[in-house]
Each structure stands twice: as structure tokens, then as C-alpha cells.
């Protein structure tokens, strides 16, 4: 079965870009046409890009490396967590702290602190503390969990990043590139696709589109894991014929096809410019920031 179909893309509104006046000229080769002042993305190129990204994830996972899902914009937060957890991978969906990759040794210390507090909750340590001390530790834990909960079990740097919105996740991209970590990213018509190893042209604002892209990447991880498990079984049963692995790499999502006549440019509906955050280098204040 196909990784994704044209019908899937159309139903999810993947083809809708931004208003023409907001485009990035470097996206020209991915744009099919313009209608009602909106750029329409070439879905034939999107399908090819998705297949390439899918294979990259399968290869990375089959080598025993992890995938880090990154999407901190509101539309992406829930889907990023859900799909990363579904395939057993890691995610950042609240805020990218500067140094998350390039200063991973410091991040690991914060993760150790989070696990220590969790252990204190269950081993009876809290029984010997005052209410004020307990409240302070619980507050610390909550804020660590909020920023780092999605990578709590990540022991090493990821093998590949999957990113929603390259403009918002600019720091994550810069860190990954400096470390030579491959990047898969959804690039909308207002984004710069340069420097992305596997750019996927598509709508990075619509929840349905984000869900489709993220689900496909998660399915690639699951398929690779299933194939790995099958190989183990085959090695244990060398004298028996192996069965068909038959994994469905994509579960169809039944959504309404968006009508151009009822379409409101996303720049007008929700506002395209987002407040920039100061995500410089990670420090204790960053980890406990309520943002």
C-alpha cells in the first residue's frame, strides 16, 4: 500500500500555502499555481518527498537510532506527542531550549534530576519532608516534565529530526546541522527549504495536515520496528518459512475535502507572525520557565 495518497493530501489541505505576498522565493520549485491570492503547493512533489522521508526514517530506525519529533506551535503540540508516543520515540512539543542537542550533557543532568524527584515520590522520601518542601519539589518536577518530559528516556543524540514549521524551530535546525544530524521538515510556502535534508512541501499550519505528516513518520518507525522483530524471529526459526510482514505503513484519515470557496487564508485566520522566544543557551531559568 502507498505511504500516502493524493486523496489523503487533498482531504488534509496539504496543498494550501500562504498568501502570495508572504512567500519565500526559495520555495518556487514546490509551488504549482496561485488561486485567489493563495499559493497552491505541487502535491506530486509532496508525495515524492514524503516517500523519501519515510525511507530515511525506516533506515535510521532499523540501524537502532532514534527519531526526535519537534513541533512547539500550538497546532502541532498534541499530535507531536501522540504520534511520538505511538511509535515509541521522543518529542519536544513545549519549547526548544537552546543547547538541547549541542549541550546535551547539561540536558542529561536535568533529566537525572527529574527522575530523582520521581523516585523520591515513590520511595517514601516525601514522607519525611515538610509540605512546603514537597510543594517545591513537585513544582520543580512539573516544570522539568513540561520542557523535557518527551525526551526523558533519550540516552543519546537522535539519529534524525522530524520538524513541523522550520521558521519556529530555527534553533533546533541550526543545532542539528552543526552536529550533522539529518533533518526532515515540513516546509510551507513562507519557509526556506535550504539546509533541510528531507524537505516536505506542505501546509504546516492546518491540524489535519500536521496530523497526516506526523502519522506517516510514526508509521515508518513502526514498520521498521516490525521488520526488525521479524528478522529476530527468522533467526530463531531458521528451519521454518517466514511469514509475510504485511505492515500497513499508513492509516487513512477520513477528513472533509477543503473547498476553495470557503477557504480563509491562514495568514488572516490565525496570524502568521508569532512572537519570537529567546531560546539561547539552556540554563536553569530556561528549564523552569513557565512559557
From Swiss-Prot:
Name of the protein in question: Small ribosomal subunit protein uS2
Annotated CDD domains: RPS2
Keyword Transmembrane helix: no
GO biological process: translation
Species lineage: Bacteria, Pseudomonadati, Spirochaetota, Spirochaetia, Spirochaetales
Location of region: Disordered: 235-291
InterPro entries (UniProt xref): Ribosomal_uS2 (IPR001865), Ribosomal_uS2_bac/mit/plastid (IPR005706), Ribosomal_uS2_CS (IPR018130), Ribosomal_uS2_flav_dom_sf (IPR023591)
This protein's UniProt keywords: Ribonucleoprotein, Ribosomal protein
HAMAP family, A to Z: Ribosomal_uS2_B
GO CC, alphabetical: cytosolic small ribosomal subunit
The keyword Phosphoprotein is annotated on this UniProt entry: no
Species assigned in the record: Treponema denticola (strain ATCC 35405 / DSM 14222 / CIP 103919 / JCM 8153 / KCTC 15104)
Disulfide pairings: none
Biased composition (Acidic residues): 270-291
Domain of life: Bacteria
Family the UniProt entry places it in: Belongs to the universal ribosomal protein uS2 family.
GO molecular function per UniProt: structural constituent of ribosome
Amino acid at each position: 500500500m502507498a505511504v500516502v495518497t493524493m486523496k489523503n493530501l487533498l482531504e488534509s489541505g496539504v496543498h494550501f500555502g500562504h498568501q502570495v505576498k508572504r512567500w519565500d522565493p526559495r520555495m518556487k520549485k514546490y509551488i504549482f499555481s496561485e488561486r485567489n491570492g493563495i499559493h497552491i503547493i505541487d502535491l506530486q512533489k509532496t508525495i515524492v518527498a514524503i516517500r523519501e522521508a519515510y525511507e530515511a526514517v525506516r533506515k535510521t530506525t532499523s540501524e537502532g537510532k532514534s527519531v526526535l519529533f519537534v513541533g512547539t506551535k500550538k497546532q502541532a503540540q498534541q499530535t507531536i506527542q501522540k504520534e511520538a508516543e505511538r511509535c515509541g520515540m521522543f518529542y519536544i512539543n513545549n519549547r526548544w531550549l537552546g543547547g538541547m542537542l549541542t549541550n546535551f550533557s547539561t540536558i542529561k543532568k536535568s533529566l537525572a534530576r527529574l527522575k530523582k524527584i520521581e523516585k523520591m515520590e515513590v520511595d517514601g522520601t516525601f514522607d519525611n519532608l515538610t509540605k512546603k518542601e514537597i510543594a517545591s519539589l513537585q513544582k520543580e518536577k512539573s516544570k522539568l516534565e513540561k520542557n523535557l518530559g518527551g525526551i526523558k528516556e533519550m540516552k543519546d543524540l537522535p539519529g534524525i529530526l522530524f520538524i513541523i514549521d522550520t521558521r519556529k524551530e530555527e534553533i533546533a535546525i541550526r543545532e542539528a546541522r552543526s552536529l550533522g544530524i539529518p533533518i526532515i521538515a515540513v516546509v510551507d510556502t513562507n519557509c526556506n527549504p535550504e539546509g533541510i535534508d528531507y524537505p516536505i512541501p506542505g501546509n504546516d499550519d492546518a491540524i489535519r495536515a500536521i496530523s497526516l505528516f506526523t502519522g506517516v513518520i510514526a508509521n515508518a518507525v513502526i514498520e521498521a520496528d516490525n521488520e526488525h522483530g521479524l528478522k529476530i524471529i527468522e533467526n530463531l526459526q531458521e528451519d521454518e518459512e517466514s511469514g509475510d510482514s504485511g505492515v500497513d505503513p499508513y492509516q487513512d484519515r477520513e477528513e472533509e475535502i477543503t473547498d476553495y470557496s470557503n477557504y480563509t487564508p491562514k495568514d488572516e485566520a490565525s496570524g502568521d507572525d508569532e512572537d519570537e522566544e529567546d531560546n539561547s543557551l539552556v540554563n536553569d531559568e530556561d528549564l523552569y520557565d513557565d512559557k
